[in-house]
């Protein structure tokens, strides 16, 4: 049994290589890991939502319509029976971690037991060592714990054999997760999204927040200041590209704890020290900081990409792809198909990289600050083609909670179902929501109301299209939306009040585009982007209402905001006698 902090990260990398869970690549520090694969429809390459269950009491089974729940005693009986003997013949690694900076009021300790040295190596890149912190518990059981086993292994490299018995059961009452018959990090790394769920449960039964947020420092030119922003974006809505904008710094890319601080602000910490990121479409043009880190010598785990002559390749990397190599399906060649006749891509669409944030040249110096950083603004990113402007500011904190609770993400590919369907994603957290949504929203309201200096809240939409189907935003335009939001937190810009929130004035955006992007921002662009589309916005309110009507105990303030916004939009329609109102008319 290997444990404590004495078995350093290098030791677990070496053991993972010895056991075949990882293999060395050409660049020093780079390794490759492959997860199990039987076909494009049957694999261990992504989170298994079907077999991820939240264990609750019998009386709570109907409180969580958006997640899988199971009666606790039944679930424990099932998963413990499957886990009986699951580590036979394996080594068990015992690891002590700290979720958040060391010696911080924010942080929660976490214990991981696993028989995978790949999991142990990944967690050492992603989390802070916590053995010394555990010694200071003095017998307290106030920590999360996670038990994981890959189960019976097969093949070379060794992968989980019995995917049909894959289980990831989250025991809220005990503050633990039991995970078996899997290796993919989203299922096996207890401290990742599994700990996010435990954190949400704990925070919402206390007086703080656990959120699916990035944390970044925003640095306007010539201002000699840093404003810190958090942001929640559903998948494919611009989260990473926002957090990694040029000239800015990153504290964290995924999960944050927030507390009311003595200076009157909400302060936030990154509970992690690394990034477990989707590698698809990371390239030198769009993601220069990450791409440089991934193509230079440093400790990095690649998973489920193609390896050719010791070099990793992935979908959308901007390079000429080889016609053959080794990937998650074994020996790969262009045109290879699985047992069902489905084409196997060069790398899995959910292929990943694991790296310490300190390896990025835009890391913020406050990454390990035990006091966290003051939150000046919060961004909620949605995706729709015809409704929301590129950015709006909430009218107040409660309206900001409403904006976060109203995030929609539009499906973009037929492989995900019907294209163009709006999916509700409150705070980009719905998949991890282990408390009733009404309680979660009410706690957000109460949290902000306890602050003397509550963050300004903004909603973004980088995917608005013209009637001809052309995107109205350039890829880097989001830098100007962010800097406008930063200026609003510092009271530098005026704004136009609309029924859905505050929108920028043209002159301010024109100046930002000129200064930061060297672009002429036209009145035509401004008009198209910030027109209030009444019919579309009313339809959005109808969708929100339909979703929340399925929930119990949604707080009154939420319904009041929704109703008032509907009234105000209809009044605007009557005033101008048309469906689309230009921002110039509202001024």
Across the structure, where does each feature detected by a protein language model lie?
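Conserved NTP phosphate-binding and transfer environment spanning the P-loop NTPase/kinase superfamily
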Residues: 4-50, 56-61, 75-79, 86-92, ...
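Short secondary-structure boundary/capping segments
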Residues: 109-116, 246-248, 264-275, 283-286, ...
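Charged, amphipathic alpha-helical linker segments immediately N-terminal to NTP-binding catalytic cores
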Residues: 150-212
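A contiguous, mid-domain pocket- or channel-lining segment that forms the substrate-recognition surface
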Residues: 88-90, 95-156
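Phosphate-binding P-loop
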Residues: 207-210, 216-226
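Beta-sheet entry/capping signal
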Residues: 1, 91-94, 213-215, 226-230, ...
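Catalytic or ion-translocation cores adjacent to nucleophile or general acid/base/metal-coordination motifs
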Residues: 208, 225-309
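Short, glycine-/Ser/Thr-/acidic-enriched flexible segments
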Residues: 100-102, 201, 219-223, 235-237, ...
């Amino acid at each position: 049994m290997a444990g404590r902090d004495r078995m350093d990260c290098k030791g677990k990398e070496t053991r993972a290589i010895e056991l075949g869970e990882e293999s060395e690549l050409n660049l020093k520090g780079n390794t490759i890991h492959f997860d199990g694969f039987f076909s494009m429809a049957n694999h261990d390459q992504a989170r298994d939502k079907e077999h991820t269950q939240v264990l609750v009491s019998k009386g709570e089974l109907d409180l969580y319509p958006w997640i899988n729940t199971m009666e606790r005693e039944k679930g424990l009986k099932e998963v413990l029976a499957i886990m009986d003997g699951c580590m036979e013949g394996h080594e068990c690694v015992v690891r002590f971690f700290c979720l958040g900076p060391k010696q911080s009021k924010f942080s929660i300790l976490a214990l991981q037991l696993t028989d995978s040295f790949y999991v142990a190596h990944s967690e050492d890149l992603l989390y802070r060592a916590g053995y010394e912190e555990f010694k200071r518990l003095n017998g307290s059981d106030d920590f999360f714990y996670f038990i994981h086993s890959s189960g019976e292994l097969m093949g070379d490299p060794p992968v989980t054999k019995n995917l049909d018995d894959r289980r990831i059961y989250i025991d809220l009452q005990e503050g633990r997760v039991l995970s078996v018959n899997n290796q993919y990090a989203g299922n096996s790394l207890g401290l990742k999204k599994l700990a996010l769920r435990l954190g949400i449960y704990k925070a919402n039964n206390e007086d703080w927040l656990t959120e699916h947020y990035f944390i970044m420092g925003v640095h306007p030119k010539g201002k000699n200041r840093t404003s810190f922003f958090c942001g929640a974006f559903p998948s494919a809505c611009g989260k990473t590209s926002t957090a990694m904008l040029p000239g800015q710094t990153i504290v964290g890319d995924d999960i944050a704890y927030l507390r009311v601080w003595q200076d009157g602000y909400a302060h936030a910490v990154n509970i992690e020290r690394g990034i477990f990121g989707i590698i698809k479409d990371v390239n030198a043009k769009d993601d220069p900081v990450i791409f440089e880190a991934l193509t230079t010598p440093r400790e990095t785990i690649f998973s489920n990409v193609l390896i050719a002559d010791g070099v990793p390749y992935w979908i959308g990397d901007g390079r000429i792809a080889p016609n053959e190599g080794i990937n998650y399906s074994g020996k790969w060649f262009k045109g290879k198909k699985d047992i069902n006749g489905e084409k196997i891509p060069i790398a899995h669409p959910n292929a990943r990289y694991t790296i310490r944030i300190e390896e990025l040249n835009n890391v913020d110096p406050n990454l390990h600050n035990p006091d966290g950083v003051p939150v000046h603004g919060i961004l909620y990113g949605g995706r729709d083609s015809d409704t929301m402007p590129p950015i709006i500011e909430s009218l107040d904190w409660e309206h900001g909670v409403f904006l976060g609770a109203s995030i929609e993400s539009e499906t973009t590919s037929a492989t995900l179902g019907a294209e163009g369907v709006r999916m509700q994603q409150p705070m980009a957290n719905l998949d991890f929501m282990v408390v009733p949504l009404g309680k979660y929203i009410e706690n957000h309201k109460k949290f902000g109301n306890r602050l003397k200096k509550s963050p300004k809240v903004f909603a973004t939409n980088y995917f608005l299209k013209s009637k001809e189907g052309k995107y109205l935003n350039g890829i880097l335009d989001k830098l100007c939306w962010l800097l406008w939001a930063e200026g609003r937190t510092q009271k530098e810009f005026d704004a136009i009040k609309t029924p859905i929130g505050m929108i920028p004035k043209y002159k301010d955006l024109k100046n930002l585009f000129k200064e930061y992007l060297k672009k002429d921002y036209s009145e035509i662009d401004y008009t198209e982007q910030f027109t209030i589309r009444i019919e579309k916005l009313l339809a959005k309110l109808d969708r929100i209402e339909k979703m929340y009507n399925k929930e119990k105990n949604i707080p009154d303030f939420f319904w009041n905001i929704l109703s008032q916004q509907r009234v105000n939009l209809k009044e605007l329609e009557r005033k101008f006698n048309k469906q689309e109102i230009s921002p110039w008319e509202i001024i």
